[in-house]
Amino acid sequence: MNTPWTHTTVLLNEAVEALLSGSTAATGTYVDATFGRGGHARAILARLAPEGRLIAFDKDAEAVAEAARISDARFSIRHQGFRSLGELPDASVAGVLMDLGVSSPQIDNPVRGFSFRFDGPLDMRMDTTRGESVADWLATAELQQIAEVIRDYGEERFAVQIAKAIVARRQERGAISTTSELAELVAGTVKTREPGQNPATRTFQAFRIFINAELEELQQALEASLSVLQPGGRLAVISFHSLEDRIVKQFIARHSKEVYDRRAPFAAPKAMKLRALERIKPSDAEVHGNPRSRSAILRVAERTQEV
C-alpha cells in the first residue's frame, strides 16, 4: 500500500511494454512527457540500448529535482509542461508516454494544497513558480465562472450551490485560503453523499484542472505528438478520470480513420495518422495494492506511415 510521500507508478509494466513495442534494447529517442517521480522513466531507461535516449518533461520543480538523481547520459529533463513537446524535431521520436494527473507526493504534501485530506494553503499549482493559486483566483472570480468551472471540470451537479456558497463566504468573512475551509464549505453545501467519496472530491478536481489548464495542455500535447512521432512510433497515455480519457479516446479515434474532403468528393482521402492498438486497465492485484490506480486507463496508438 502507498504511504504518504511515496509514489507507486500505475500500469508500470504495461505502459513501458506498449511504449517500447516489446523491445528489450530500444535504440530510439523516447519521451516521458510527465516525469513525476520517475517510475516510468527508470523502467524505460532499463530497457534502452546504449544509443537510446529518453527526454522527460515536467513543470513541477520537485519532479525536476528528483530527475537530477538519475545519473545516466541517455537521460535529460526539461522544466516545462508537456505542451512543449512540439519543440522537438518532427518525426524524431520513437515513443511518447503521458501519465496524467497528480502524483502521490503532490497529493500527500499539505503545502501543495491538492487534497481535502490535509489542511494547507489552497494552491494546487503544478508549477509553483508561476501563475495564480486557487485561493488567489477564488478571491476575485465571478460566481458564474466559479460555477462553470465546477460543473465543466468536476462534473458536479451542485456546482451553482457550491459557487454561491463560496461567494457568500467571501463577502461575509473573506476569501477561502485553505483546503480545510473549502472542504468544509462544500460538505456543508452538498447534502447528498456518493458512497465512498468525499463531497469535496469533484470541486477539488475541478479547481485543479482549471488552475493548471490541464485539459487544454493535454489537447496541445496530443496534437504535438503527431508531429514528433516517427512512423511506427507509439503513443501511450494513462488517464485517471472521464474528462481526460474522453479527450484521448476521441483524439485517437479522429486520427485513426481516413478523412474525406466534402468539397472534393472525388479526391483521394487523407490517410489516417494513427492506428489504435490497446485499451488497458489495471489488474485486480494492482488495484488491491494501489487503490489510486483503480480509475486508470491506458490507451495505446501507433503512428502510421503518413507524416
UniProtKB/Swiss-Prot annotation:
UniProt cross-references to Pfam families, sorted A to Z: Methyltransf_5
SUPFAM superfamilies in the record: Putative methyltransferase TM0872, insert domain, S-adenosyl-L-methionine-dependent methyltransferases
Entry's EC annotation: 2.1.1.199
Binding annotation for S-adenosyl-L-methionine: G38, G39, H40, D58, F82, D99, Q106
InterPro entries found in the cross-reference section: RsmH (IPR002903), SAM-dep_MeTrfase_MraW_recog (IPR023397), SAM-dependent_MTases_sf (IPR029063)
Subcellular localization: Cytoplasm
Single annotated GO MF: rRNA (cytosine-N4-)-methyltransferase activity
One BP term from GO: rRNA base methylation
Superkingdom as given in the UniProt entry: Bacteria
Record carries keyword Magnesium: no
Catalytic activity field: cytidine(1402) in 16S rRNA + S-adenosyl-L-methionine = N(4)-methylcytidine(1402) in 16S rRNA + S-adenosyl-L-homocysteine + H(+)
Keywords: Cytoplasm, Methyltransferase, rRNA processing, S-adenosyl-L-methionine, Transferase
GO cellular component: cytoplasm
PANTHER family assigned: 12S RRNA N4-METHYLCYTIDINE METHYLTRANSFERASE, S-ADENOSYL-METHYLTRANSFERASE MRAW
Family: Belongs to the methyltransferase superfamily. RsmH family.
Protein purpose: Specifically methylates the N4 position of cytidine in position 1402 (C1402) of 16S rRNA.
Name of the protein: Ribosomal RNA small subunit methyltransferase H
Originating organism: Variovorax paradoxus (strain S110)
Recorded name of the encoding gene: rsmH
